Swiss-Prot record:
Signal peptide: none annotated. This is Na(+)/H(+) antiporter NhaA. Keywords: Antiport, Cell inner membrane, Cell membrane, Ion transport, Membrane, Plasmid, Sodium, Sodium transport, Transmembrane, Transmembrane helix, Transport. It comes from Nitrobacter hamburgensis (strain DSM 10229 / NCIMB 13809 / X14). The chain crosses the membrane at residues 42-62, 69-89, 110-130, 140-160, 169-189, 192-212, 215-235, 238-258, 277-297, 312-332, 346-366, 380-400.
């Protein structure tokens, strides 16, 4: 039996809208379905990248990634340009959920928000504790603080109706808040030397985007043109270029035009981008960044401070932080347990939050831009911690009895 959104009381009431409009839970269901299948795609390309990086084709793989195209390497185009589109989608999702979705009220934000906070703080503390004797390594403190929603929902999708829908919504909301935290971390802690002129031009472009929103411009084309201009100025300013995607997302109108199309510009852009990001951009990023050669590496390499701190932070830190903070919030009656979910369900999802992959790899690149060795060690830690979290989280949820009624 396939669980349907809106089937259970905790998922909220179905809303009847004008003909042709998207129902909120249709949007969420579509999002979850695509993210789940995208997670499986991401697993495949990550495994393929590892295989190529440790095969006779490794020189070709690395040569293509470091080939210069229009002044940047292919890897830089992927990490700076394609990932800006990924962050644009992240920004759109954050804005929609905060204004008109699962995070629209403080009561809905409480449990995923508190759990997300724990899931960022505890892994960072573990990483710092492991790497305290190596000051140069401490720039990577935020690496294990991220959750990869595509991977996590991909694992949940393998469990079918054994997992309550409310728990999938909880994980989605937590991951969105986690992404918001990652965006703030990148903006505050991983900014290079700034170029004042480019910052001024970027700010002027932002004002232009704000003016379009303020005057009710609904066509997407003007926003996208200014978004490309903003990306260029941000790229040259010293701030990481991907943040231009988030800034552009905040300017896209959420309200539909009166007498116009049935959906808002934000919804149109989100649904247009979703398949491209899920099945092209994120897999390309994973393929380009997951490949690490194990040649010359022994088991002792896993005990180096960076991979050990990342792996322990993702696997132990995430589950302790997410589950511990969620338990405290429920015990203090600040938040409620997701409907039809048990403590075992919640713990299993907390373990799955240790799948860091996309955002963890991305932060690792920002943390150690000049050290290929530390970047490779980061990849090893991310792959190890994420794999353990995925396998153990799946096993916990697989053996946990479904706590909600079967309905047809």
């Amino acid at each position: 039996m396939r669980v349907r959104f809106g089937q259970y009381p905790n998922c909220g009431k179905r809303m009847v809208l004008e003909p042709g409009r998207l129902r909120p839970y249709s949007i969420l269901r579509s999002f979850l379905d695509s993210e789940a299948s995208a997670g499986l795609t991401l697993m495949f390309v990550a495994a393929l990248a590892l295989l190529l990086a440790n095969s006779p084709f490794a020189p070709v793989y690395f040569d293509v990634l470091h080939r210069q195209v229009l002044g940047l390497t292919v890897l830089h185009w992927i990490n700076d340009a394609l990932m800006a589109v990924f962050f644009l989608l992240v920004g759109l999702e954050i804005k929609r959920e905060f204004l008109d979705g699962q995070l629209a009220t403080w009561s809905r934000r409480a449990l995923p928000g508190i759990a997300a906070l724990g899931g960022m703080v505890v892994p960072a503390v573990i990483f710092i504790a492991v790497n305290g004797g190596e000051p140069a390594n401490l720039r990577g403190w935020a690496i294990p603080s991220a959750t990869d929603i595509a991977f996590a929902l991909g694992v949940l999708s393998l469990l079918g109706p054994r997992v309550p829908v409310s728990l999938k919504i909880f994980l989605t909301a937590l991951a969105i808040l986690d992404d918001l935290g990652a965006v703030l971390i990148i903006a505050l802690f991983y900014t290079a030397e700034l170029t004042p002129l480019m910052l001024i031009l970027a700010a002027a472009t932002l004002l232009g985007l704000a003016a379009l929103n303020r005057f009710g411009v609904k066509p997407l084309a003007p926003y996208l043109v200014l978004g490309v201009v903003l990306w260029f100025f941000v790229l040259q300013s010293g701030i990481h270029a991907t943040l231009a995607g988030v800034a552009l997302a905040l300017a896209i109108p959420l309200q539909a035009s009166t007498g116009g199309g049935p959906t808002s510009p934000l919804h149109r852009l989100e649904h247009a981008l979703n398949p491209w990001v899920a099945f092209l951009i994120v897999p390309v990023f994973g393929f380009a960044n997951a490949g690490v050669s194990f040649a010359g590496l022994g088991l002792s390499a896993l005990l180096d401070p960076v991979p050990l701190g990342v792996a322990l932070g993702l696997f132990f830190g995430k589950q302790v932080g997410v589950f511990g903070f969620a338990w405290l919030a429920i015990w203090l009656k600040i938040a409620d347990m997701p409907r039809y979910a048990s403590w075992a369900h919640l713990y299993g999802v907390a373990v799955l939050c240790g799948i860091g992959f996309t955002m963890s790899l991305f932060i690792g690149l920002l943390a150690y831009p000049e050290s290929a060795v530390l970047q490779d060690e980061t990849k090893i830690g991310v792959l190890l911690g994420s794999t353990l979290a995925g396998l153990i989280g799946w096993l916990i949820l697989r053996v946990t009895k479904a706590g909600f009624p079967e309905r047809t």
